[in-house]
Structures are given as structure tokens and as C-alpha cells.
Design a protein with these regions (language model features):
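Thiamine diphosphate
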Residues: 1-37, 43, 49, 53-249, 253-254, ...
Length: 407
């Protein structure tokens, strides 16, 4: 730098001396500062949340306290063959965000140019928003790192993983940077990561995984999993407005499913609070808890049971983190039998965590063991007959429900 005339003689030594003095001053301030009060260990993980504490479910004051918190039935707009697909709803949600806030931009692989992402989801937006739908290198760590930096700089990035499987190469940016920055030094990281996910499409082990459990146990990340077009659009609005990093899981098998279409208004919907489950069907004989594409499997099974005079409730979690524990426990207390259904493999899954919560906090109200139906503990097979054997079928879910009812 001296040879090029960028800095003068002695500048380097002076800058080094100034830097060392600054570090020494800050280090001295930290050393002299008092230790924080122990109760602060549970603070500042997410914005606007109560201090996190350990729950002791055996305390008399906490047992059965969620019994009165059963949410109302929330079906959303009826399914309509003339309505919008799940994919179109996500497109509308991105359009809502881009039009409402100039700080919003989309960043990901093949999202811009003339392509509009691997599913052409963003193509309708390119004509008006080409300068804010930006192609990234083929590097998921770079996508997520740019989003973290942009969020810290005051922007509202919507990052895209072309398939949620690919997030593995950007793991550090999510779990060690985005998730921990608020807890470490109090800064907000308002970013959304769109995560196309799931099987049911014969796409093999690198384009079909369920990665939500990877992040479910990471404090500092929020996770939403809409199951309907209406919720997809409304939850995306909530995610973009949120001050914390949000993983937005959109199930690929729902994208163009003709059975899952809803008429959506031209104007943006009211946001849905992240962390609020939806009771899709009321019942008292059995509670079926699910999220994502398998909510629709749960609804079909509940419909079959109803033909035999058995009324099963269906709870659509919508958010995994934060989790609507009150709705989950209230339904367990009301029904006494709980069937958890998801596409993910069983071991270490969200379902196992839900079962543990119910067993610990509602044990006295249960009439049967909590049952979990998930995929086999294998990678996702590519071959159609193998994938069909890997995934939990509607028939398996119905069988599990009837066995639970007969217990």
C-alpha cells in the first residue's frame, strides 16, 4: 500500500497502534463489567417474547393449565377449482412484499434473468421487479451470508434455496450467524429463507428431504409451514415483517395440486401471527396433529372416520418455531388420544418432540399412548415404488387412527 501511495510512511504503524489501543480499551471495559444476572440466560433469543424458562410439568400450578385454550375452528377459504394454486399464492406473497416495502429483495439461484426460479414461480414478477430479483452464484452459503449481511444493514431479504436439501452447504450462516446474532449482540436479522421441500414427487434423496428438524432445535430461528394457498400468502407477509430470521417451508407437492386451490383477493391478506396453529376440524374422539402437505392426508382420514360416526379433530400447526403449545395441549386434553402425522422420518423428528411435550404435560388426561406416523428411517428413495413404501400412506394413517381409537 505504501508503494502504491495509498498510505504514507508510518501510517501502517500508527493504524496498528490505534487498533491495539481500541481493542485494549474495549477488553478492559468487558473485564470490569459485572457478570449478568443468571435469569438473563433466557432473554433475547427472539424479539418480543417472554423470558425463556424451564417448565416443570409436575408442579400443581402448571398441570392442565392449557385446557381452556382450544382455538376456534379456522378452515380458511373453501377449496375451489377456480382458485389460485399454492404456487400462485406464494408468487402473490412475494409480489405483496416487493410492492409494500422497497427494502425487500429476492436473492437466490436462477431466480432472476428470464428464468424466475426452478418452478417458474417468480417469472410473473420479473417484468416489474427484475432489479430486485437477483441471481446468486451456485453457493447456498453465499446466498444466506448475503441475506444475513443485508438484514443487518437494514434490508429485508428473501433468500431462496432452490430445494431445501441444498441448505446443508449454508448451515453455518443459519445456525451460527442468523440464529445467534440477536442473542450474542442484540441486533435484529429480519430475513426470510424460502425452502421448497418434500417428497410425494419421486425426485430422490437430494430434492425431497424434510430438513425442518435440522433447524427446529436451533434457538433463534422461526419456522413456518403453510398447508393452504391462503396461509402461504398470509404467512409470507408475516415472515417478511418479522424482526427475526424465518425459514418458510413451501411443500413442492402442493404447488400445483388441483385439490388445494383457493380464491384469493387481489389485495394482500391480513398477516397470520407466526406461532398460531389452526384447528381445521373439530372433534373429541381423536386429535390428529400435522403440518404441510400431510394436513390434507389428516383431513381425508378424519373424513373417513366421520362416516363411521367418529369425530376426529385436525390441528394444522402452521408454525413449528415458535410452537403453539397451548393449542397442542388443549387438544390433547380434550381428546385424550393424539396421532401425530408428518412426512419426515421418525427418529429425532418434530413429531417425537411433540409427543414428549404431550406426554410430559398432559399425561394424566391421555387414554392411549401418543402415536407418531412418519417416513421410514432411510434416505428418500428415487424409485416410485420405493418412495411409496418410504412415505406414510393415507391407509397407514387411517390404520394408526383406528388402532389408537380401539386402544
Amino acid at each position: 500500500l505504501e508503494a502504491e501511495g495509498v498510505i504514507g510512511g508510518g501510517d501502517l504503524a500508527r493504524m496498528k497502534e490505534e487498533a491495539e489501543a481500541l481493542v485494549a480499551e474495549e477488553a478492559r471495559a468487558v473485564i470490569e463489567a459485572p457478570w449478568p444476572e443468571p435469569h438473563r440466560a433466557g432473554e433475547n433469543v427472539l424479539a418480543k417474547e417472554p423470558r425463556r424458562i424451564r417448565i416443570e410439568p409436575l408442579e400443581p400450578s402448571t398441570r392442565g393449565q392449557a385446557a381452556a385454550n382450544l382455538p376456534p375452528v379456522e378452515t380458511g377459504p373453501p377449496f375451489d377449482a377456480k382458485g389460485k394454486t399454492f404456487l400462485e399464492a406464494v408468487t402473490m406473497g412475494v409480489a405483496d412484499a416487493l410492492s409494500a416495502d422497497p427494502r425487500v429483495f429476492v436473492f437466490g439461484e436462477d431466480v432472476g434473468g428470464k428464468y424466475g426460479n426452478a418452478f417458474l414461480l417468480l417469472r410473473p414478477l420479473l417484468a416489474q421487479c427484475a432489479d430486485r430479483i437477483i441471481n446468486s452464484p451456485l453457493a447456498e452459503g453465499a446466498v444466506l451470508g448475503v441475506c444475513v449481511g443485508a438484514a443487518l444493514a437494514g434490508q429485508r431479504p428473501i433468500g431462496e434455496m432452490q430445494f431445501n436439501d441444498f441448505v446443508a452447504t449454508g448451515f453455518n450462516q443459519l445456525v451460527n450467524n442468523a440464529a445467534k446474532i440477536r442473542y450474542r449482540w442484540g441486533e435484529s436479522v429480519p430475513m426470510v429463507v424460502r425452502m421448497p421441500w418434500g417428497g410425494l414427487r419421486h425426485a430422490g434423496p437430494y430434492h425431497s428431504q424434510n430438513t425442518e428438524a435440522w433447524f427446529y432445535r436451533t434457538p433463534g430461528l422461526k419456522i413456518v409451514v403453510p398447508s393452504t394457498p391462503y396461509d402461504a400468502r398470509a404467512l409470507l407477509a408475516s415472515a417478511v415483517a418479522d424482526p427475526d430470521p424465518v425459514l418458510y417451508y413451501e411443500h413442492i407437492a402442493l404447488y400445483r395440486d388441483p385439490r388445494v386451490k383457493q380464491v384469493l383477493a387481489a389485495e394482500a391478506p391480513a398477516p397470520i401471527r407466526i406461532g398460531k396453529a389452526a384447528l381445521r376440524r373439530r372433534g373429541s374422539a381423536l386429535a390428529i396433529v400435522s403440518y404441510g402437505a400431510y394436513v390434507h392426508v389428516a383431513m381425508r382420514v378424519a373424513g373417513k372416520l366421520a362416516k363411521d360416526g367418529i369425530e376426529a379433530a385436525v390441528l394444522d400447526l402452521r408454525s413449528l418455531a415458535p410452537l403453539d403449545r397451548d393449542a397442542l395441549l388443549a387438544l390433547a386434553l380434550q381428546c385424550g388420544r393424539v396421532l401425530i402425522v408428518h412426512e419426515d422420518t421418525r427418529t429425532g423428528s418434530v413429531g417425537e418432540s411433540l409427543a414428549a411435550i404431550i406426554q410430559e404435560e398432559a399425561f394424566e388426561y391421555l387414554d392411549a399412548p401418543v402415536r407418531i406416523v412418519g417416513s421410514l428411517d432411510t434416505p428418500v428413495p428415487y424409485s416410485p415404488p420405493l418412495e411409496e413404501a418410504f412415505l406414510p400412506s393415507e391407509e397407514e394413517v387411517e390404520k394408526a387412527a383406528r388402532l389408537l381409537l380401539a386402544y
